[in-house]
């Protein structure tokens, strides 16, 4: 039997999309690893083919006991606590930092590819989003857990025995995120608000930005998966890379794209932001006190390192990617 490909966080948002992409390449010898305490996540895997499922704790034990020695070709490590508002730092560091370190060691010992999820949250409130230490200053313990693991990876560069590729995901949106609750993308929340209430609510301005004009690099999960598959096919390429479009867009842009995608499905004409505001389709609510000082009002991936590595794929704009996503949501 061929070696396994392992996907941690396999029932989660990005992990499930990676499993599906592997299936589409003919790969089914997949070990899916996750924590199904929130059982609804299983729905993300019902249209996927896998060889086995292991709980995240069981998988770590299997790895440390040597049961999988010689049996793993690659690990996509997407599993983590991704709640940026989580305040239990001890849990966050154990789950995101220590666990990742154990899997990295296993892959280096085994000569297996290790492709893992980092995060744009490592950059904090900075204005430059380049993969270098001077740009990194996380605002919360989630970002710190990702930052610290990236630092441990950097210390291994000279001695690495197999591919290590870390991906600093920016604001990812797309199918299979329905279980994420408050941490789901704004496109998902806007879609549900519009369907339920006929309008969309955004945060008022902050950090000098007008209402809804805070800007992020919103990237489709379809593009994120394509980047992961490219690195799987290029085991000679290692590094830490931003994964975003390289172009920031406003939350207003996402809201307009979402509403217009819904309107198009109903045979209605597209509207501008001004028209939506005038008709009460887009409104604003006070910026939450709990997020002040912990919120990234601006992100934009510097994709130069990704391009230098050889990846030349294009990325969907908010308008393109959101339209594709809303079409999927309307079909579900």
Swiss-Prot record:
Pathway: Nucleotide-sugar biosynthesis; ADP-L-glycero-beta-D-manno-heptose biosynthesis; ADP-L-glycero-beta-D-manno-heptose from D-glycero-beta-D-manno-heptose 7-phosphate: step 4/4. NADP(+) binds at residues 13-14, 34-35, 41, 56, 78-82, 95, 146, 172, 180. Its EC number is 5.1.3.20. Gene3D superfamilies: NAD(P)-binding Rossmann-like Domain (3.40.50.720), UDP-galactose 4-epimerase, domain 1 (3.90.25.10). It holds the Pfam family Epimerase. Contains a large N-terminal NADP-binding domain, and a smaller C-terminal substrate-binding domain. Catalyzes the interconversion between ADP-D-glycero-beta-D-manno-heptose and ADP-L-glycero-beta-D-manno-heptose via an epimerization at carbon 6 of the heptose. PANTHER family: ADP-L-GLYCERO-D-MANNO-HEPTOSE-6-EPIMERASE (PTHR43103:SF3), NUCLEOSIDE-DIPHOSPHATE-SUGAR EPIMERASE (PTHR43103). This is ADP-L-glycero-D-manno-heptose-6-epimerase. It comes from Thiobacillus denitrificans (strain ATCC 25259 / T1).
């Amino acid at each position: 039997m061929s070696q396994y490909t392992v996907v941690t966080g396999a029932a989660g948002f990005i992990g499930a999309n990676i499993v599906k992409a592997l299936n589409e390449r003919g790969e089914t010898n997949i070990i899916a690893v996750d924590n199904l305490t929130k059982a609804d996540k299983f729905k993300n895997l019902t249209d996927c083919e896998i060889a086995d499922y292991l709980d995240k704790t069981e998988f770590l034990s299997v790895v440390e006991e040597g049961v999988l020695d010689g049996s793993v070709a690659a690990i996509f490590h997407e599993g983590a606590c991704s709640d940026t508002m989580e305040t239990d730092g001890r849990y966050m560091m154990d789950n995101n930092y220590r666990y990742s370190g154990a899997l990295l060691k296993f892959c280096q010992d085994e000569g297996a590819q290790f492709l893992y999820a980092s995060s744009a949250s490592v950059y904090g409130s900075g204005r430059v989003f380049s993969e270098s230490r001077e740009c990194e200053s996380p605002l919360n313990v989630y970002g710190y857990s990702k930052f610290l693991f990236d630092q441990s990876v950097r210390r291994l560069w000279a001695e690495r025995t197999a591919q290590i590729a870390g991906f600093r995901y920016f604001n990812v949106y797309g199918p299979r995120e329905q279980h994420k609750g408050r941490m789901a993308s704004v496109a998902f929340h806007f879609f549900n608000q519009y369907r339920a209430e006929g309008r969309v609510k955004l945060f008022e301005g902050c950090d000098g930005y007008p209402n809804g004009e805070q800007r992020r690099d919103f990237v489709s999960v379809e593009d994120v998966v394509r980047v992961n598959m490219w690195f799987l096919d290029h085991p000679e390429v290692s590094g830490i890379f931003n994964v975003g479009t390289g172009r920031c867009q406003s939350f207003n842009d996402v809201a307009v794209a979402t509403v217009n995608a819904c309107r198009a499905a109903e045979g209605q004409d597209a509207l501008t932001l001004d028209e939506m505001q005038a008709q009460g389709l887009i409104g604003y609510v006070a910026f939450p006190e709990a997020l002040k000082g912990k919120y990234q009002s601006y992100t934009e991936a510097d994709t130069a390192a990704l391009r230098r590595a050889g990846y030349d794929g294009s990325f969907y704009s908010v308008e393109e990617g959101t339209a594709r996503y809303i079409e999927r949501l309307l079909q579900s």
